[in-house]
Regions:
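Short, Lys/Arg-enriched N-terminal segments with co-localized hydrophobic residues
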Residues: 1-7
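Glycine-rich phosphate-binding segment of PLP-dependent enzymes
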Residues: 46-47, 51, 90-91, 101-126
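Conserved PLP-enzyme active-site core in the AAT-like
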Residues: 125-344
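Long amphipathic N-terminal alpha/beta scaffold segment
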Residues: 59-104, 108-111
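Structural signature of PLP-dependent enzymes
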Residues: 344-360
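Short, flexible active-site-proximal loops enriched in glycine and acidic residues
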Residues: 79-90, 118-130, 149-150
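Long amphipathic alpha-helical segments
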Residues: 8-77
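Short Gly/Ser/Thr- and Asp/Glu-enriched loop/turn motifs at secondary-structure junctions
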Residues: 18-19, 37, 88-92, 300-303
């Protein structure tokens, strides 16, 4: 047994034959000059490659010098690749969540490109005083939707959170059970409502909710009637949901706020273009919604954003809430959204703007 131990101890560790970091970089510089990477970056990459090889030494035979060199070059080149890459959407799903949702129109990309230097993000150019970054977008949304006021946050889930936090914290929000949706990434509407500080009151059943269900649930603590458009699924057959107009009738004479979460949202009637119909923002407001919220990066075709429109007194409360600053959008998204919304100002040339065309 003593001989056996001596033989095992005398067996050389193959990892000792691995090249040093310095020698590896010298060979790399001579064979594959990569001037775009600093010496420190090359050292870090070489260390990662060698550490990975050492960690797997008990498996397959160790790679030779040339293979190690190729791994190092690949490691460095991967540093130069952006995390987001251009792809061709061959899925058949136009608004694909994992592929970036809507394709931005050329007008939006051109507008963003102009922001190479400083810009009038939050300044009144006439007075030189601080302004509101959403003033331009608000003006466009007022003209397009007929709303009294509007503001923008970074996505529609954020819009839901902000609206309920500003208008319903500590109070009850009534929602149909058939509209308690789950969106991408396992984020559920009841969880968003809980984070807002509002108290969820469920009414009706999964497939059927009647006006009387809302009326019977209203108490002195009720503040919001919330309608949610289930954009990512449909319940068909033996069903009944309460419309925005019916909810508006229910809240008549009561100190309640009707909030309509349209999800994808539409600023034009898609049926006129041979597409499946979706509730429009204008229709929601005409039906009596006090506040409507929807995504800017789906049917509208703009950047990721959550758009909130409605009565001015409620939009002002929403805009002044502390969460509004935490959820606000940056200059690039704001500019791209503004350029996209301008395409909706002329319905007669809407098809020519390309917003209903599919781009690869």
């Amino acid at each position: 047994s003593g001989l056996h131990v001596r033989i095992m101890n005398d067996t050389p560790d193959p990892r000792r034959n691995l090249p040093s970091i310095d020698s590896l970089i010298q060979i790399l510089d001579a064979k594959y000059p990569l001037p775009e990477f600093s010496h420190d970056q090359k050292v870090d990459a070489a260390r990662r490659v060698l550490d990975e090889i050492r960690a797997r030494a008990s498996g397959p035979p160790l790679p030779g010098r040339e293979e190690i060199l190729e791994r190092l070059r690949a490691e460095l080149e991967s540093l130069g690749n952006l995390g987001l890459r251009r792809v061709v959407n061959g899925t058949g799903i136009v608004l694909h969540t994992n592929l970036g949702r809507a394709v931005l129109p050329p007008e939006a990309m051109a507008a963003v490109a102009e922001l190479e230097g400083y810009c009038s993000l939050q300044i009144d150019l006439e007075s030189g005083r601080r302004g509101r970054r959403d003033s331009g977008v608000e003006d466009l949304l007022r003209r397009i939707t007929g709303a009294e006021a509007a503001t923008v946050v970074n996505n529609n889930a954020a819009a839901t959170l902000l609206v309920l936090a500003a208008l319903c914290a500590g109070r009850d929000v009534i929602v149909s059970r058939g509209q308690l949706i789950e969106i991408g990434g396992s984020f559920r509407l009841p969880d968003v409502i809980a984070q807002s500080g509002a108290r969820l009151v469920e009414v009706g059943t999964t497939n059927k909710t009647h006006p009387r269900d809302y009326e019977n649930a209203i108490t002195d603590n009720t503040r919001v009637l919330l309608r949610v458009n289930p954009s990512n699924y449909r319940i068909t057959g033996f069903t009944r949901q309460v419309s925005t107009a019916e909810l508006a009738e229910i809240k008549q004479g009561r100190d309640l706020i009707l909030v309509d979460d349209l999800g994808c949202g539409a600023l034009v009637d898609l049926a006129a273009y041979g597409l499946p119909s979706e509730p429009t923002v204008q229709g929601s407001l005409r039906a009596g919604a006090d506040v409507a919220l929807f995504s800017g990066d789906k049917l509208i075709g703009g950047p990721q954003s959550g758009i909130i429109v409605g009565r001015r007194k409620y939009i002002d409360l929403i805009r002044r809430h502390p969460l509004a600053r935490a959820l606000r959008v940056g200059k690039f998204a704001m500019t791209a959204l503004e350029a996209t919304l301008k395409l909706f100002l002329n319905p007669e040339t809407f098809r020519e703007t390309g917003r209903l065309n599919v781009h690869s």
